[in-house]
Every structure is written in C-alpha cells, then in structure tokens.
Amino acid sequence: MCRLLGYSSRDAAPVAELLGPENFRAFTSLSALHADGWGMAWYAGSRPAAWKSPDRAGSERVYDKLGWQPLGDHGLVHLRWATPGLPVSDVNTHPFSYGDYTFAHNGAIYPQERLAAMLPPEWERQLAGSTDSERYFLHIMWRLAERDGDMIAAIADTVAAISADYTTTSLNAILLAPDAMYAISFYDRSMVPVEKLREFGHGDDADEVAAYFDLAYQATDDAVLVASSGWPMPGWTPLPSAHVLVTDRRTLATTVLPIRTANS
C-alpha cells in the first residue's frame, strides 16, 4: 500500500509550494507508515526525469530538497509501503518509466505467483523489478500500443483484465504522459489492510480505515493536484472509484471519466 501525489501547474514550481508548506509536511509525515521507499518524477519538457530511493522519505534530506525545487510543471510523488513478498529495493521503488510515460501505484495484486501471466513474454522481459505495480504499468503500455495511443481505452482494458483475473485491493495510480496526467481510482474498500494498519497504530479510526484508498483532487487556475488520503484535504473533490481524472497539461482542463469494466 502506498501514497500518491500528482500535479500539473501553469509553470514549473516546487511541489511543496503547490501544496503549501504545512500540507507538504503533512503528506510527508505519511512516510512514517509508508516507509519502504519514495520517488519523485517530473517533466520540464517532453521527457520524464526521476529520483527514487528505497529509504523513508521523511528521513532523507534529498526528499525535502527536491520538494522545494521547481523541477517541472508536471510530476508526481510516491511513498511506498511494500506488499509482503515484494522486496524493498531500488528497482522495485516507484515511479516506473517507459518511453515518455511514468507511473506510480497504490495497491496490491494477488496471487503473486501468477503475476508473470499478466503480460505477454515480450513485455515481461521489459521488467526492471519484480512488482505487481510495474507489471500493471507495462500492461497499460501494452494495451496503449494495441489501442493506437488511446490512453483511456488502454486504462479501461487493463483495469478490466486485471480485476477479472486477479484479486486486487486497489488499482489506484497516477500515470503521467507528456501532455496529460491520468489519476486512476479503482479500489475495494473491503480490502483495506486493517490488521496491518493496526500494527502501526492506525487501524482503530473507522473513518480513517474507510477512507484509506480514497483519492481526491484540487483544481485552481494555476494547478491541479491529486492525492491519496491520510492528511487534511478540506475543499478537495473526491474522485470516485472506477473513474479516471484526466488533466490536460497545457490548459489544466480536467475531465472525470468512468472506467468501464464488467463489474462497474
């Protein structure tokens, strides 16, 4: 399980400035639980750049340093809480990149012993690590090629295929393309890891548990932000499950579209 934060803004700006210092600290504090690595990706042009580490975000000066730099106008932040059985390592740390696209995921896909069947062999060979998340991303890239660049169709095909063939807790994700940000909301509230949360002192607040997989977004004239729950987000707009928020990088126009699957 992980925490997600994505942004598109008029001009290159520090993500800490877009959120505000207090909110950036609040989001970063979630790394006390989501302590198995962190990553940032950003676009200053048409190609993504990234920095990631398998250590805890709140313990690394470089995380705060990057958070206060105007890296780009389009980017994401990921805090990882590793799924048991998937190693904490550089190659398993989000975000993942393929060509001009970059991606981060919150959730788990089971059973792990069947993950290799998620991709055709030629796409499985593209893996850098061993996670369900990277395979989820490459599945979208595979479908994108089959769909002649139709990202919404590729996302819908992927979510439908994975949710039909595997058990998923959440397929929440942020996918950045050179021209748009896609925030994918697709989760099962019954799959919130309550016992794991309780191990870390977080599972007794019913509202917190119920909202664990929630995504919400904030759109202003200067920026669009989308993020996971767990910190104060007054005035943000909930992004319902089985929907994708599309943000046009150039205009900052937002569109919320349903993800069509057999069960949604």
List each model region and its residues.
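Extreme N-terminus nucleophile/cap motif
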Residues: M1-G58, H202, V224, A242-V246, ...
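Conserved beta-strand-loop-short alpha-helix elements that form
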Residues: C2, Y101-P111
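Short acidic (Asp/Glu) patches
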Residues: F24, P54-L66, H78-G99, M118-W123
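Gly/Ser/Thr-rich active-site loops/lids in small-molecule metabolic enzymes
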Residues: L127-G129, F186-L215
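Catalytic core of PPM/PP2C metal-dependent serine/threonine phosphatase domains
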Residues: D148-D188
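A conserved acidic, glycine/proline-rich C-terminal tail/linker
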Residues: F200-H243
